[in-house]
Amino acid sequence: MTDAPRTKITYATLRADNEELHAAFEAAVEAARARLGGGHPMIIAGQERAGEGEFELRSPIDQDILVGRFAKGTRADVQDAIAAARASQKAWAALGWERRVELMNRTADLISERVHEYAALMAIEVGKNRLEALGEVEESADLIRYYARMAEENGFYEKPMDNLGDPATHTRSVSRPYGVFGVIAPFNFPLALAAGPVSGALVAGNTVVFKPASTGAMSGVVLMEALRDAGVPDGVCNMVLGPGETVGDELASSDAIDGIVFTGSYVVGMGLQRNFTKAYPRPCIVEMGGKNPAIVMKSADLDKAAEGIMRAAFGFGGQKCSANSRV
């Protein structure tokens, strides 16, 4: 006898009347409670780092629930994390894209295997309902798989070019990593919008300094856990924790990183875009939200359309860039 294949979880396939899903989630909530309230260090060069004091994270569902105590990093911790990423980058790039793809796919598989546990922690941490939390965790795994698949399908973007009729000339376009990337993730998609940019940078041969939102720090912890358990070497992805005005600012303003990905507010994102590339061109990818329309066709079922628009606009309190804002 073989186990039945696991149902693929997506935002589209999730249903509130799925009793099996609810039973698995409820069991995961009980398991997740055992992880609440503990202390969580930063991870720099594969080593735990205590930082300068701690900050507490409490659940928006119930302020009596202590999600955890997290290390409060300093500017010096960020500098050390950047140095660790720099020291690891050449060996990571030399590993070869095929091996990096293998490690990213393994990370994605671990996240999928732990979907209920990670979703339960996310629901407690940021207050998402269980369906949205489950959808996000599986989306996180799929984003990692996407970057891995793009590298595979395109042979890591190594392409022969025209020799202009000279048989002695061999010209190729090749892909090379930039070096060290900073990734600053938001609270509203604390796993997906960390896993996506982190894995995109890693599969390309870059190393990473990752800062989760302080209100999404547990999701940062589980991403680092999955990367470690998949076999990603120490120092390749480093996690710093703490306030945006110190830890985030040190990362965003550093001349020692080669690119940055940020998801968050318009004010911070525009300031980052203006300042990060001022001295010289560097990749600066900022996502600051949008105005998302819904179009209701004449042939639509109006009851279903109205419910869909309502859920799209006000799910998770509307606190997401994908929330419907125009009809």
Q: Whereabouts are the PLM-identified features?
A:
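Glycine-rich loop-to-alpha-helix module at the N-terminal edge of alpha/beta enzyme cores
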Residues: R58, D62-E158
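Generic beta-strand/beta-sheet core signal
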Residues: R58, L121, E136, Y147, ...
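Conserved small-residue-rich beta-alpha loop and adjacent elements
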Residues: Y157-D234
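ALDH superfamily catalytic-core signature
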Residues: G231, G259, V267-V327
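Hydrophobic face of amphipathic alpha-helices that form TPR/SEL1-like repeat modules
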Residues: M1-V67
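A structured beta-alpha segment of the ubiquitous adenosine-cofactor-binding alpha/beta core
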Residues: H170-T171, N238-V261
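Generic hydrophobic/aromatic pocket-lining and core-packing "Φ" positions
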Residues: V198-S199, G248, S325
